[in-house]
């Protein structure tokens, strides 16, 4: 095999490896939470403590709920928090916030809003607890932000997604019809 063929084969192997994304080796966040997927319920993945997380399949597709979190984040959150959880000049990077904050604190802030006023800043986040497009998908949004925060999921629309399960669809219909 000549050098050109070897280089082409190496480049092809690297390309294939990049297409099949995988869970990162880091499973414990700075806040101490283990993000290893343990079980699935209503089409969503959770860790052993019942906290939403994400999972890639063997072909590198992200689970549907996390993909849905991308969609809901893009529709409801990115206006203030920037695309892909990266933050903006007036709102924090949520992909970093979820690595440090407790899931239940995240829920509380999303549901009730938050205001931080001091000499350096005046940050106000409105409450989204009554917005079904956010609250029915809070676990999905959280899982998406975790995947972004750990850099397991690159910027932009996820390239591959798992199927939407009947269980997910039923739970979604139930929540949206309340």
Model segments located where?
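Short acidic/polar micro-motifs centered on Gly/Asp/Asn
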Residues: 56-57, 82-87
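Axial heme c-ligation environment in periplasmic c-type cytochrome domains
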Residues: 24-29, 88-95, 113-140, 145-165
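Sequence context surrounding c-type heme c attachment/ligation sites in exported
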Residues: 70-78, 87, 100-107, 135, ...
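Post-cleavage N-terminal segment of exported redox proteins
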Residues: 2-5, 12-64, 144-160, 164-178
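Sequence/structural segment immediately N-terminal to covalent heme-attachment motifs in c-type
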Residues: 62-83, 111-112
């Amino acid at each position: 095999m000549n050098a050109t063929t070897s280089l082409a084969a190496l480049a092809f192997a690297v390309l294939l490896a990049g297409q099949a994304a995988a869970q990162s080796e880091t499973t414990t966040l700075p806040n101490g939470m283990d993000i290893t997927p343990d079980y699935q319920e209503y089409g969503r993945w959770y860790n052993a403590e019942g906290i939403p997380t994400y999972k890639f399949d063997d072909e590198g597709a992200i689970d549907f709920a996390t993909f849905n979190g991308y969609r809901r984040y893009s529709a409801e959150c990115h206006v203030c928090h920037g695309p892909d959880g990266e933050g903006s000049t007036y709102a924090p990077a949520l992909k970093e916030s979820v690595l440090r904050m407790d899931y239940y604190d995240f829920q509380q802030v999303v549901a009730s809003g938050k205001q931080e006023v001091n000499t350096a800043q005046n940050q106000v986040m409105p409450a989204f607890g009554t917005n079904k497009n956010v609250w029915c998908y809070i676990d999905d949004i959280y899982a998406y932000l975790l995947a972004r925060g750990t850099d397991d999921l690159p910027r932009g629309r996820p390239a591959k997604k798992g199927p939407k399960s009947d269980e997910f669809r039923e739970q979604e219909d139930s929540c949206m019809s309340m």
